Amino acid sequence: MSSHEHVFAVFDISSSSVAGAHVLSRTDTCPNALILTSVRIDAVVTDDINIQRFITQANRSLEQVISTIRAQDVHKPSQIQISLASPWYSTETRIISYRSEKPFICTKKLVESLVDTEIADIKKTDGPFGSYGKDSVIIEKQLSGIKLNGYLTHEPYDKKATELECTLTVTIAPKTVLDLFSDTLRRSYGARPIRFTTGAFTAFIVARDRLPIE
């Protein structure tokens, strides 16, 4: 395999199914991705709703998906990415406000400091997952809007204001579930970097990058 080629293992875990694929990525061609093999296994539907059984079944489906795609493709992925769908994560939106009687300069450092403080506060609270466990992990964070003196702006830095408002969106997942999925992947693929993402943030990034800013 050339230095321009990399193989990734990609998984999609939702409430209704688990899917997986080995994807060959090339940096010297367009299109630059080729699906080498893929499979999807539907979840087992039962009338008896039991959280622990639900988690166990999802992990068992993940094991089956891994076994199938590894049997169909001999490549050894260098990285692993998992996209989580509901109910495996929760989305929270926080409004961060900063005010001063005297005008101040809005800087990237100031915004990052406010975001870091808010993230630290989120980490101190119990996760919203009930039976999934209290410990949670922040998967993604994104500033979805910044207002100066009440007006939304796409270029806030180096401008004077007396009021700053940031809209912060984070996705959170139960640590016990992430650890379970990660352990299953490492048993099959070894010590590969594992990255978790969510369907919500994937859609946001695609929309942000494709739609014009007005």
Name each model-derived stretch.
Residues M1-S17, A21-Q79, L84-E214:
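Nucleotide/phosphate-binding catalytic cleft detector across ATP-hydrolyzing
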